[in-house]
């Protein structure tokens, strides 16, 4: 019996699709530049002048329709790139708020809000907090519909360090992480 050798497939470093499908994604220009840097042969096979003229001749679409399709595709790609840039600016403009809330006597809880913008799984993050700090941690909804992580105990400094480290790993160094003390008003 002959041994079957698995095929190796190259995936784009930008959109994670095979390079043949990059043109259908939102970041075609960046994908094309990545392919040119990483695999010259495949780039020449897909995007050389000969390959493009052969593709146009093989298709039954008229030149005018092809130009219209190209224009629409380019417009869509520009919209997608602008959207990605807006999302990045939104992430950089947002801030993470760590509140230290006094409960009774010497008991405190830490409330972490503003993390939903960064597309983090808050349940996994609360599990990480509870195992790292050996306390209870849960995800709750606030009055305005956003989610926050509530951690039992006074571990605000450790939470701040962990969050800044996680944001640095994602390449978001400019995000503000601030701590706020919220004290209960005494009854008179």
UniProtKB/Swiss-Prot annotation:
InterPro entries, per database record: DENR/SUI1_TIF (IPR050318), DENR_C (IPR046447), DENR_eukaryotes (IPR005873), DENR_N (IPR048517), SUI1 (IPR001950), SUI1_dom_sf (IPR036877)
Annotated GO CC locations: cytoplasm; ribonucleoprotein complex; ribosome
Domain of life: Eukaryota
Compartments (UniProt record): Cytoplasm
SUPFAM superfamilies (UniProt xref): eIF1-like (SSF55159)
Key word Ribosomal protein present: yes
GO biological process per UniProt: formation of translation preinitiation complex; translation reinitiation
Residue intervals of the SUI1 domain: 96-167
Keywords on record: Cytoplasm, Ribonucleoprotein, Ribosomal protein
Broad class of where this protein is predominantly found: cytoplasm
An example Gene Ontology molecular-function term: translation initiation factor activity
Protein family (similarity comment): Belongs to the DENR family.
The protein's assembly and partners: Interacts with the 40S ribosomal subunit.
Notes on the domains: The SUI1 domain may be involved in RNA binding.
UniProt xrefs under NCBIfam families: DRP1 (TIGR01159)
Protein name: Translation machinery-associated protein 22
């Amino acid at each position: 019996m002959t041994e079957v050798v698995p095929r190796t497939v190259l995936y784009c470093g930008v959109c994670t699709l095979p390079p043949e499908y990059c043109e259908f994604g939102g970041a075609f220009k960046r994908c094309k530049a990545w392919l040119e840097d990483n695999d010259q042969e495949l780039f020449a096979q897909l995007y050389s002048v000969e390959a493009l003229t052969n593709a146009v001749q093989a298709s039954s679409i008229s030149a005018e329709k092809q130009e219209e399709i190209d224009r629409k595709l380019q417009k869509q790609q520009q919209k997608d790139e602008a959207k990605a840039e807006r999302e990045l600016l939104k992430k950089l403009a947002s801030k993470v708020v760590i509140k230290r809330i006094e409960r009774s006597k010497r008991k405190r809880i830490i409330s972490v809000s503003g993390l939903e913008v960064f597309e983090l799984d808050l349940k996994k993050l609360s599990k990480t907090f509870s195992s790292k700090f050996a306390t209870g941690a849960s995800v709750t909804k606030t009055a305005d519909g956003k989610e926050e992580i509530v951690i039992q105990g006074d571990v605000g400094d450790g939470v701040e360090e962990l969050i800044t480290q996680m944001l640095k790993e994602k390449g978001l160094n400019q995000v503000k992480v601030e701590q706020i003390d919220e004290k209960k008003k005494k009854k008179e």
